[in-house]
């Protein structure tokens, strides 16, 4: 749950035309629960939090006990929202328990000085409090008491996809090809569910730090603070202030403020490209001309003979070239400049299902040994270890 956000940047955009999202009934809505045909608008105050939300309203003292008084050594991560703490509660009663007993939780505590505010906290409660799906992180509860605003989630022991792709440490081994495709499929199913006719939600901030992994490396989407209800009736898009993260936001959304499900598809394409290449969406530590992953990779993606040049050297060649070409082609389609040329998420899921390996997937320890000699291989210089470049939020 240690999602990290960078500095927010104001951006207002003029309105022009935007491509309409694809329709159709989604099979991914069938194994999930949602309160109505569409999620109600984000409440403006805690008094408007829907009583139907299937989450617990915690007292602040309960969460203080569960996290051992928010001790520094229980911090899982920090971000624009605030800090995330590890805690323990009883699985049935949800009452705080002793460390190491009961259910592990992640408690996100709003920083009153932070740039992510109360409205995003409300949006998170509103969406995750009503939506239930295998590929969405579970919101256990929330706390609103005086000035305190907290969110309580299921604990995701493998952390974020971002850490596994970009953090260099013995704790994070290079992800195998099969495991990357498994994670991509899970995340795609989560987005397909959100875009379904039953839900009609645009995620708006799909990126590696918002894809969390459970013990089995199953992907779950987190952080719904920027989520938006999709267009209704005969409307083709939602007009909104430009928000999200540089490097992941679709070009037409940046230019017009028009938001569609195809905006999420573009963001997914960027993340898939990060998974294929082992490079960040934006990295100013790279050589000139390679700062923007999409711009750098697009020419290689357009040629099957050159696709191998973008593939992560840490994969150690342990993949089928035919499957790599298919995944690269899918990424290219998702990052199409024209939204109408992008597939919908159900189509993305269908392609990714073809790329799954029936064998057990997992991190390959041997890849870590090979990476030291191959990091300067097919996809260029060794990934930067100068620290994480800040992903700037668009607000």
UniProtKB/Swiss-Prot annotation:
SUPFAM superfamilies per the UniProt record, alphabetical: Protein kinase-like (PK-like)
Pfam families linked to this entry: PK_Tyr_Ser-Thr (PF07714)
Active site: 205 (proton acceptor)
Keywords assigned: ATP-binding, Immunity, Innate immunity, Kinase, Nucleotide-binding, Plant defense, Serine/threonine-protein kinase, Transferase
Enzyme Commission number, as recorded: 2.7.11.1
A Gene Ontology biological process term: innate immune response
Similarity remark: Belongs to the protein kinase superfamily. Ser/Thr protein kinase family.
Protein name per the record: Receptor-like cytoplasmic kinase 176
Organism of provenance: Oryza sativa subsp. japonica
Name of the gene: RLCK176
């Amino acid at each position: 749950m240690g999602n990290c956000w960078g500095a927010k940047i104001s951006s207002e955009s003029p309105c022009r035309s935007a491509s309409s999202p694809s329709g159709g009934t989604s099979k991914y809505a069938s194994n999930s629960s949602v309160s109505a045909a569409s999620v109600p608008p984000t409440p403006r105050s805690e008094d408007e939090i829907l009583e139907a939300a299937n989450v617990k309203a915690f007292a602040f003292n309960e969460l203080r006990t569960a996290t051992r008084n928010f001790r520094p050594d229980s911090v899982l991560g920090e971000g624009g929202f605030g800090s995330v703490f590890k805690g323990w509660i009883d699985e049935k009663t949800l009452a705080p328990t002793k460390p190491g007993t009961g259910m592990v939780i992640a408690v996100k505590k709003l920083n009153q000085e932070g740039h992510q505010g109360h409205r995003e906290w409300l949006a998170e409660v509103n969406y995750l409090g009503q939506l239930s799906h295998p590929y969405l992180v579970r919101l256990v509860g929330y706390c609103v008491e005086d000035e305190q605003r907290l969110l309580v989630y299921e604990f995701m022991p493998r952390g974020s996809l971002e850490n596994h792709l970009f953090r260099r440490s013995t704790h994070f081994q290079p992800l195998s090809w099969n495991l990357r495709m498994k994670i991509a499929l899970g995340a795609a199913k989560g987005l397909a569910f959100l875009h379904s006719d039953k839900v009609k939600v645009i995620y708006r901030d799909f990126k590696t730090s918002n894809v969390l992994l459970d013990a089995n490396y199953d992907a779950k989407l987190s952080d719904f603070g920027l989520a938006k209800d999709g267009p209704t009736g005969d409307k083709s898009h939602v007009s909104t202030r430009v928000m999200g993260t540089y490097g992941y936001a679709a070009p037409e959304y940046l230019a017009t403020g028009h938001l569609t499900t195809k905006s999420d598809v573009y963001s997914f394409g960027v993340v898939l490209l990060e998974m294929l290449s082992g490079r960040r969406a934006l990295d100013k530590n790279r050589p000139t001309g390679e700062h923007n992953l999409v711009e750098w990779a697009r020419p290689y993606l357009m040629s099957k003979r050159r696709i191998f040049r973008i593939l992560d050297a840490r994969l150690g060649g342990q993949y089928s070239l035919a499957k790599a070409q298919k995944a690269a082609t899918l990424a290219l389609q998702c990052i199409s400049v024209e939204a109408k040329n992008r597939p919908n998420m159900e189509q993305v899921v269908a392609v990714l299902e073809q790329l799954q390996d029936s064998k057990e997937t997992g991190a390959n320890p041997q890849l870590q040994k090979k990476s030291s000699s191959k990091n300067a291989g097919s996809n260029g210089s060794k990934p930067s270890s100068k620290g994480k470049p800040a992903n700037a939020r668009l607000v």
